[in-house]
Amino acid sequence: MKTTLNKIRVHSPCANGWEKLLKNLGKTRADDEPLALTTILESNGLDDALWCLRAVDGHEREMRLYAVECARSVQHLMTDKRSLDAIDVAERFANGKATQQELNAAWGAAWGAARAAAGGAARAAAGDAQANLFILMCEGAL
């Protein structure tokens, strides 16, 4: 999965992350050379690589399935059925087996569950698993 520095720049990246990426690429300004998201991951880390997904054309299905896999990697921590149901609906939607209306309803219910169970421990535990899944998504292995 690839983007370009010009596509990233259009979305106004944070100054620190932008300068770090340019430096690690040995560049001083944006260009249209294809840039692998895994290169951004190696340079700047998972948060910046995920942020750069907004600068990728297409691949909506892969991105949604990545989110599903990230959620599944920590679903053992989920105790609210609304969250588990939302994962299933998101996967079905990515595969063309659920409607936008079903997805919206599941999303709303899941946010209600998330607000009820908000906590940083689950997010921290998921970080490494998400980075590994991100690489698989970028390589087309999901």
Give the label of every model feature segment.
Residues M1-L142:
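Short, glycine-biased loop/turn motifs at secondary-structure junctions and
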